[in-house]
Amino acid sequence: MSSSSSSLDDEDTFKILVATDIHLGFMEKDAVRGNDSFVAFDEILRLAQDNEVDFLLLGGDLFHDNKPSRRTLHICLEQLRKYCMGDRPIEFEVLSDQSVNFGYSKFPWVNYQDNNLNISLPVFSVHGNHDDPTGADALCALDILSSAGLVNHFGRATSVEKIDISPVLLQKGHSKIALYGLGSIPDERLYRMFVNKQVMMLRPREDESSWFNLFVIHQNRSKHGPTNYIPEQFLDEFLDLVIWGHEHECKIAPTRNEQQLFYVSQPGSSVATSLSPGEAEKKHVGLLRIKGKKMNMQKIPLQTVRQFFIEDLVLSDYPDIFNPDNPRVTQEIETFCIEKVEAMLDTAERERLGNPRQPDKPLIRLRVDYTGGFEPFNTLRFSQKFVDRTANPKDIIHFFRHKEQKDKKDSITINFGKIDSKPLLEGTTLRVEDLVKEYFKTAEKNVQLSLLTERGMGEAVQEFVDKEEKDALEELVKFQLEKTQRFLKERHIDAEEEKIDEEVRKFRETRKTNTNEEDEEVREAIQRARTHRSQAPDVEMSDEDDDALLRKVSLSDDEDVRASMPARGRGRGRARGGRGQSTTTRGTSRRGRGSASADQPSSGRATKATGKNMSILDAFKPSSRQPTARNVAKKTYSEDIEDDDSDLEEVSFTPSSVIESRRTSSTSTSYSRKSTQPQSQATKAHFFDDDDDEEDFDPFKKSGPSRRGRR
């Protein structure tokens, strides 16, 4: 750090190191790339320590997996303890009501104010879509770090109906920062909440113009669909700087939004998690200086990040070299690709920084468009030539081509070519739920869903794939089936198949138009799955437990007995008799399976098993034959849980009246809900570009009026 910049770091200047999308644990089992995320995180923490920043600000996705491995958690805790604990004094204070900012924690205060901890580097972080709160208690990996006193987790939304973003108010000398944060929320849901004006950013009542308003968000910034992103215009115009996480391309130099008149900085990821063009940009973190309403962002290149080079090769652009009719054209293409890869390896060797901690094997990706009658060659044989020279030998070459859409009246026509090429060209990620939606949009009428909804199926598939909720699909089907049965019963429809099908179709179309009701259905179904999982026993039942259960069970026939028996009722499938019991005597005991007393009431297990296999037509049979359907409908589940990522559940939190009383208890922490008005030139933050990373700079020099022109 230059002497001129050091002289400007006085007692009124905040110094903040900004980073996002660290993705700890990415490819941790890979022999070559397994430590890349940990090495980059170590460098980020070391930069924060060396630059003596006031705190480290993370924009989400600290972990790559929702349930990080034991090794990943251990390394993360080691690094945080190494760099964040010490005797260096903290020179800023928190003015806001911390019980509101961190109210969802058992320790609702910043870690450096804990008398039992000695923190020298505070870390503030929101959660991302990879490490978002899930499960029965709506916990995430950041909550573990928060309970350990190493990270201050803020910006967590606790309601799916209305979001009030309360800032963490910080002061250093005469400089004051209102730090807003919003952890990852499904983009479609958050988009809808912004449109319905259900997102409110609270502001300090006193001296609104004296606060530097800094907002950390983790959402799609680029448009992936009509509502699958958050437009910058949705954000309040009183903001001065927005730190945008989730997008991996490094665009850390703040850019001005001419409509809202704030600046947006996109730090990008510190590790390449996909071989896309956006990840090939040089990785940086930012050293943000804030003094009063002025700011400066200094780009700091990361020197331990693995090099990544990507190129496109369109074979049809070389008609003089490649002729599809040539029998040896495939060998010529392979030779040409080898030359391209060798050239990229030479470039990587020249650009290597000489840092001993930087990985020596670069990532190489050559995307080959073989549209025009060409054939791909054997990529496995090709990869063997670069096993010892690249970090990703198995996927150096990626073949793709643009398929023509064929119009056939009697076939399902899905443009998979468009689906395949879009992620390659735009660096986007293909999602399973999008494939489900795309399939049913173009599928024939005879294979369309008649009872379930595409949106519900997509959400359940997402939970199954991303969150390992194995019962999500089953519970969704059961829930929507039960709801349809109740609807038909209330309508008193005759038990005729044609009429039932017509009513089911109308009911399904009605539910599709009511997105809020459908979201509630999905949340209820996933809540059932999580409640069922949280209540499932972790150990196998003993013989005594099994006998006690059998004494309570009463069924009418052997089929119901077999359906109601738990799958894990006995260890390793052994019969109730002793290990040495003769096979001729097994099952002949007076307390054998299925011989429970007939005059005892039926158990819940039997009811559930019977109701599970009931069809819609069965629901219209005489009530005396199906007593279990009502029991299933009466079963209640806890509704105290929320999952911010999957739009599936709700969380009970501190009542709004209590929160309001906390907010008004102190004049220094009171907030205003009034709508924000356009600010004058004097109250907005000033930004000064830093054209050269290596040059000395004055972050607080005066700017001309044209730099921050107002309306």
Swiss-Prot record:
Ranges of biased composition (kind: Low complexity): 656-676
Q: What does the entry list as the binding residues for Mn(2+) 1? A: D21, H23, D61, H248
Give the residues annotated as active site: H130
Keyword hit for Endoplasmic reticulum: no
**Enzyme class (EC, first level):** hydrolase
Might you name a Gene Ontology BP term for this protein? meiotic DNA double-strand break formation
- Bias (Acidic residues) ranges: 639-650
Molecular-function annotations in GO: 3'-5' exonuclease activity; 3'-5'-DNA exonuclease activity; DNA endonuclease activity; manganese ion binding; single-stranded DNA endodeoxyribonuclease activity
Query: Which stretch carries the motif GAR?
Result: 570-593
**The keyword Nucleotide-binding is assigned to this record:** no
Where this protein primarily resides, as one coarse class?
A: nucleus
Keywords of this entry: Chromosome, DNA damage, DNA repair, Endonuclease, Exonuclease, Hydrolase, Manganese, Meiosis, Metal-binding, Nuclease, Nucleus, Telomere
**Positions annotated to bind Mn(2+) 2:** D61, N129, H218, H246
Spans of biased composition, class Polar residues? 599-613
EC number, as in UniProt: 3.1.-.-
- InterPro entries attached here? Calcineurin-like_PHP_ApaH, Metallo-depent_PP-like, Mre11, Mre11_capping_dom, Mre11_DNA-bd, Mre11_N
Cited SUPFAM superfamilies: Metallo-dependent phosphatases
What range does the record give for the signal peptide? none
Q: What does this protein do?
A: Core component of the MRN complex, which plays a central role in double-strand break (DSB) repair, DNA recombination, maintenance of telomere integrity and meiosis. The MRN complex is involved in the repair of DNA double-strand breaks (DSBs) via homologous recombination (HR), an error-free mechanism which primarily occurs during S and G2 phases. The complex (1) mediates the end resection of damaged DNA, which generates proper single-stranded DNA, a key initial steps in HR, and is (2) required for the recruitment of other repair factors and efficient activation of ATM and ATR upon DNA damage.
What is its quaternary makeup? Component of the MRN complex composed of two heterodimers rad50 and mre11 associated with a single nbn.
Q: What family is this?
A: Belongs to the MRE11/RAD32 family.
The UniProt entry, under PANTHER family, shows: DOUBLE-STRAND BREAK REPAIR PROTEIN MRE11
Q: What is this protein called?
A: Double-strand break repair protein MRE11
Organism field: Xenopus laevis
- Lineage of the source organism? Eukaryota, Metazoa, Chordata, Craniata, Vertebrata
